[in-house]
UniProtKB/Swiss-Prot annotation:
Family: Belongs to the TRAFAC class TrmE-Era-EngA-EngB-Septin-like GTPase superfamily. AIG1/Toc34/Toc159-like paraseptin GTPase family. IAN subfamily.
Gene that encodes it: Gimap6
Protein name: GTPase IMAP family member 6
UniProt keyword annotations, A-Z: Cytoplasm, GTP-binding, Nucleotide-binding
Disordered: annotated segments: 37-91
Length: 305
């Protein structure tokens, strides 16, 4: 356990722990607090559509994973192997059989020009969302596309430029509550272009936390576009050697969940990078026993709840 603590803190140099977002502390609380002292750890393709019609509220008191919407699957270790001293898994208290959603909702967020819509197209394996190089936002409404992947239905939600700091968090929260499909995302894909982590990207991450709450980062995966620009280097090397403390802090807050996308890739390469992304999604599901993120917007008027 000390190995994980030292390795994580060591990766961010002299940055003080007080600068970390709340999920960073939550991450270590799950490791340390959950273990008593002295004890060992134990569909056919559809076209993209605007999500503008009235939906059931995403704020529901009912369980986020319904029995009839899930399949039972034997418990297994997550894809990522954590080198814990006990040799056992990171998340504790999972049942031998757990609920695994048959439909997974992935929410794409990112600044204008990050490659967000192109990433959605890569995930879907077709041109479902309009994507082009532009200084102005191309996506102006919530859109979704679906595909089947390894027996699951993936629902990919592409978002307009609502995470800009110019927008009011309360108004943005209401839009999401009214328009986003119930019950909530199983994973948030924060799209960042390789070599271009700017103040705008940081603002998107902050706005994401303001809207959803700090715990949203426990469901967030960093997706780096233009992976092809890394040439012979790996994504891991890029993150470790970029000398951008803000990016490293965000990566730690997201528990080092990240992957790279070449949105020009086709065929086997395209499917391989989707598989890597889904391994990260599976890890989130494993840690949360199959539950999606329960969205709570305290600043939204009660009539929308």
């Amino acid at each position: 356990m000390d190995w994980l603590y030292r390795k994580t803190l060591g990766s961010i140099g002299s940055c003080s722990i007080e600068t970390f977002p709340w999920p960073f502390y939550s991450f270590f609380q799950r490791i340390y607090i959950s273990t008593p002292p002295g004890k060992p750890e134990n569909s056919p393709e559809t076209s993209a559509t605007e999500v503008g019609e009235q939906r059931p509220s995403c704020l529901s008191a009912s369980p986020v994973v319904e029995e009839e919407e899930c399949e039972h699957r034997p418990e297994k270790n997550p894809t990522r192997q954590w080198p814990l001293d006990s040799g056992q898994g990171l998340t504790k208290g999972l049942k031998e059989k757990k609920l695994t959603p048959k439909r997974l909702q992935l929410l794409l967020v990112g600044k204008t020009g990050s490659g967000k819509s192109a990433t959605g197209n890569s995930i879907l394996g077709r041109q479902a969302f309009e994507s082009k190089i532009s200084a102005r936002p191309v996506t102006t409404t919530f859109q979704k596309g679906t595909r089947e992947f390894e027996g699951k239905e993936l629902e990919v939600i592409d978002t307009p430029d609502i995470f800009s700091p110019q927008n009011q968090p309360e108004a943005t929260a209401k839009k999401i509550c009214d328009l986003l499909a119930s019950p909530g995302p199983h994973a948030v894909l924060l799209v960042i272009q390789v070599g271009r982590y700017t103040a705008e990207d940081q603002a998107v991450a902050r706005c994401l936390q303001e809207i959803f709450g700090n715990t949203i980062l426990a469901y967030t995966i960093l997706v780096f576009t233009r992976k092809e620009d890394l040439a012979e280097g790996s994504l891991e090397e890029y993150i470790q050697e970029n000398n951008n403390k803000s990016l490293d802090v965000l990566d730690v807050a997201c528990e080092r969940r990240h992957c790279g996308f070449n949105n020009k890739a086709q065929g086997d390469e395209q499917e391989a990078q989707l598989k890597k992304l889904m391994e990260e999604v599976e890890l989130i599901l494993w840690e949360n026993e199959g539950h999606c993120y329960t969205m709570e917007f305290p600043n939204v008027p009660s009539k929308t709840l």
